[in-house]
Amino acid sequence: MRFLQSKLLLIGSGKWPEKIASIVQSQNLVSEITNIAAREFLKLGTKQVELLLQGKTLWIATTPENQLMILEQIKGLRNKVIIEKPIALNLDQLSRLFTHNRISNNKLYVSEPWRHSEIWGKAKNRLTSFSGFKKLQINRGGPIERDYMDPPWDWMQHDLGLLSELLSINDRSLEFQCKFLNNGKNLEIIIESRNQYQIEINLGLFQERTEQWILDDKLFIDFADRDSFNDQPTCNMFKFVCNDEFTSDLESQVWLTSEIITKLEEIKFA
C-alpha cells in the first residue's frame, strides 16, 4: 500500500473539525485543507460542489441528519469520504445511510481512530489469544450534553466498532439487551456470546471523561490515559483511507452498531 498525500475538504464547524485539521497538518499528511460549515456547503449548487470536491478527500463532521443531506448532495461523485460518529440516531437514518452507500460512487469510511491505534492492536491480540469465557465491562462517556441528541449516542460507536472486530456477524449465539437509564442520558447494553464473552457496556453521562475496559474485574484498557500510548490513531486512520489500495465496506464496519440501533428501535415501539 502506498500513502497518497491528499487535499482535504473538512465540512463542519466547531472544535472537532479544528482538531482534525491541526492533527493532519502537524504530520504533513495533506497538501491543502479547505474548511466549510455544513449549512454553507448545503447551499452550494451542483457545479460548485463538483469544483470544491475535485481531487479531495472529504471529512464530514456534523450532525447525522446534515451528514445524510451532504451525502445525498455528493452521491454522483467519486471521492473518499470519512463520516463522523454518530452515524445515525435511529433506524430511519441508518437505513438512509446504507441506501446511500449502495447507490453512491463514493467510498465511505466511519471515523474510528482507535481501530488504527497501537493500544487496540495489542489489546485485540491479547483478547483473541485468551481461551475460555471472558467477562468484559466497558464504561464510556463524559459530562457533555448536546441539544440534538442524548449522551449515549455520542459514545456508542467508539466501543461497538472495536467489539465488531472481536465478535462475528455470523455468530448465531449472540444475544443483545439494551436499557436506557437516567431519563435517556445513559444506556446499558449487554452482549452475550456463548462460550466467549459476556459484555456490559455503560454509555452516556458521566461526571468526568471515562473510557475504560475492565476484563474479569481488572482494568484492561484506559483509553483516556493518553500517556499509555505513543502513536497517532487519527493520523494512522487518515493514512489508511488515503492509501492507493483503500476499499470501503461500510456495512461490515458498522454491523454491530446496526444490530444495537435495531434493538433500540424495537424497545421504543414495544
Regions found by a protein language model. Give the residues of each.
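Beta-strand-loop-alpha-helix segment that lines the small-molecule cofactor/substrate pocket
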Residues: 57-64, 68-112
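Rossmann-like dinucleotide-binding domain that binds NAD(P)(H)
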Residues: 142-207
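N-terminal Rossmann-like dinucleotide-binding module
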Residues: 1-43, 52, 270
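NAD(P)-dinucleotide binding in Rossmann-like oxidoreductases
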Residues: 179-185, 190-251
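C-terminal helix-rich "cap/oligomerization" subdomain common to oxidoreductases
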Residues: 1-2, 8-11, 41-44, 55-62, ...
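Catalytic nucleophile loop
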Residues: 17, 67, 159
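A contiguous active-site-proximal alpha/beta segment in oxidoreductase catalytic domains
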Residues: 88-144
